[in-house]
């Protein structure tokens, strides 16, 4: 099985398309396909903050529907799903950019994109365990003792990470560095916490290299075990990145 796992896109369509071309995907029959039958895996948070969330939804929906990609929801995806269901959610932390795009559409197009995203979300797994290659893709990661579970505790961890319930001075949730204590045999590939370079620790790989915050969009290729990145077109915001050499908690 040959896969390309792509980090948090956050509405950065141009960077995503550039990365797909760099990975060797070409547009065929109206969508991206690879001559070597590779498949794409999205680690979640495909929307919010970036300029083209609606177009990214359409692209990911099409790829998944045609069985050319897998999609794993992230915390931003969960919030957008609840918004589309009619629940009251706070339109901030990036959601406001997606809802603004959504409201600019005609009612017909709004209905279309809403139903596409709901279908995409509801048909996707909480996390993806590819047992034949011993790889697990989970948005914010998953510790060894939760692998195989899908209860509320597991869902919270997979979407938000190992949260403490506390916040730092900037309002960001403080998270424990779960990867430092992971000792499982399966490789865990995840995103959620922006880092300047992919972080490899104890069979865990963080590939959220903060494209929407001006750094780069990264893919991890398997079985090659190599990283492929493209530069971001967004403004660089240094304070959005975690330096684990300075602190093991976020």
UniProtKB/Swiss-Prot annotation:
It catalyses: P(1),P(4)-bis(5'-guanosyl) tetraphosphate + H2O = GMP + GTP + 2 H(+). Its cofactor is Ni(2+). Gene3D superfamilies: 3.60.21.10. It comes from the Bacteria. The keyword Nucleotide-binding applies. One of its GO terms (cellular component) is cytoplasm. Its EC number is 3.6.1.17. Keywords: GTP-binding, Hydrolase, Nickel, Nucleotide-binding. GO terms for molecular function: bis(5'-nucleosyl)-tetraphosphatase (asymmetrical) activity; GTP binding; nickel cation binding; phosphatase activity. Belongs to the PrpE family. Asymmetrically hydrolyzes Ap4p to yield AMP and ATP. This is Bis(5'-nucleosyl)-tetraphosphatase PrpE [asymmetrical]. It comes from Oceanobacillus iheyensis (strain DSM 14371 / CIP 107618 / JCM 11309 / KCTC 3954 / HTE831). The lineage of its organism: Bacteria, Bacillati, Bacillota, Bacilli, Bacillales.
